[in-house]
Design a protein with these regions (language model features):
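Conserved, structured C-terminal
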Residues: 1-147
Length: 147
């Protein structure tokens, strides 16, 4: 069941997002509206960081190795850009629907999405590096208006 939320790009509280991350780092800024003059809990804190650079950014990766359970992705695996660690995974699983190993994680916020798209990325599991690609959108592109 966990892979279904990952295929749809849904974050897991406690793994993919926690009090340590803000909405901008987690890629959830689309859920914040400043158009209405409504004071909500945390509004002033979010407004303070709205235009500041982010220290880390949430990403989705698919591995080029596409065997179920190989590698066994869990969380806290290092993410490499070439030979430098740039972040850590937060969740991982194999998608039987899409025949892909999928992992979520956070990487340095100063690396652009364009650079990540064209870069040689790797995820290290059990001392072995697996080639990975940035997944720009969720694998499952359902329209959730009916849910």
């Amino acid at each position: 069941m966990d892979i279904m939320r990952m295929e749809s790009g849904f974050l897991h509280w406690g793994h993919d997002i926690s009090p340590e991350e803000n909405q901008y780092q987690a890629g959830l800024s689309f859920a914040i509206s400043y158009k209405k003059n409504i004071d909500f809990i945390g509004r002033s804190a979010i407004l303070k960081i709205k235009d500041q650079p982010i220290s880390k950014q949430f990403i989705m990766l698919t591995l080029k190795e596409n065997k179920p359970g190989e590698p066994l992705l869990l969380h806290e695996e290092p993410i490499y850009l070439k030979d430098k660690i740039i972040g850590r995974t937060t969740s991982g699983n194999y998608s039987f629907c899409f025949n892909k190993n999928l992992t979520f994680g956070y990487v340095n916020g100063n690396i652009s999405k364009d650079e990540l798209k064209s870069a040689k990325l790797y995820v290290e599991v059990a001392k072995k590096k697996y080639a990975a690609e940035l997944q720009a959108n969720s694998l499952n592109q359902n329209n959730f208006k009916t849910i």
